[in-house]
């Protein structure tokens, strides 16, 4: 943990033709979460990630969701990954490796992470339904690809059930 007034936090703004994104993250926060992307299930995913990680997370995205959610989800994920990398800084005092197996209702997920500085993703899941509400589930892997690329982490995710 940082000493004194040092905080592991970052603010990233990303603007493209299709979207405008603001991500603020404080790894030493208290679990305050505010996520608004215009894509409800993606908001839920990011909110749960922040909540269960115990950090503060603010995400404000406006995008061309009237066309589809691809650009909004991609640009937000890239900005989140960059903010995570910046907040981790030199990673002093942080264990390099971590893993968990978590049941989420009907879903069982196993994840392992390496804060190596080298982006790499393995994402395995069984056949999925195309939509959860209005969310295009084919974007799931792309979310993680985008986060991994900017966070510069190695991540293995296996959806074992559900």
Feature annotation, model-predicted:
Residues 5-162:
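Structural preference for solvent-exposed beta-strand-turn elements
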């Amino acid at each position: 943990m940082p000493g004194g007034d040092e905080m592991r936090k970052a603010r990233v703004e990303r603007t493209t033709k299709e979207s405008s994104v603001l991500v603020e993250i404080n790894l030493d926060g208290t679990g305050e979460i505010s996520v608004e992307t215009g894509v409800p299930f993606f908001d839920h995913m990011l909110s749960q990630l922040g909540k269960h990680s115990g950090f503060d997370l603010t995400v404000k995205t406006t995008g061309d969701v009237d066309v589809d959610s691809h650009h909004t989800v991609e640009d937000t994920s890239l900005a989140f990954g960059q903010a995570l990398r910046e907040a981790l800084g030199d990673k002093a005092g942080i264990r390099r490796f971590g893993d968990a197996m978590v049941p989420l209702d009907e879903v069982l997920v196993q994840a392992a992470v390496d804060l190596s500085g080298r982006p790499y993703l393995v994402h395995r899941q069984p056949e999925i339904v195309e939509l959860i509400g209005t969310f295009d589930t084919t974007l799931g892997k792309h979310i993680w690809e985008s986060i991994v690329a900017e966070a510069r982490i190695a991540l293995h995710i296996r959806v074992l059930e559900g």
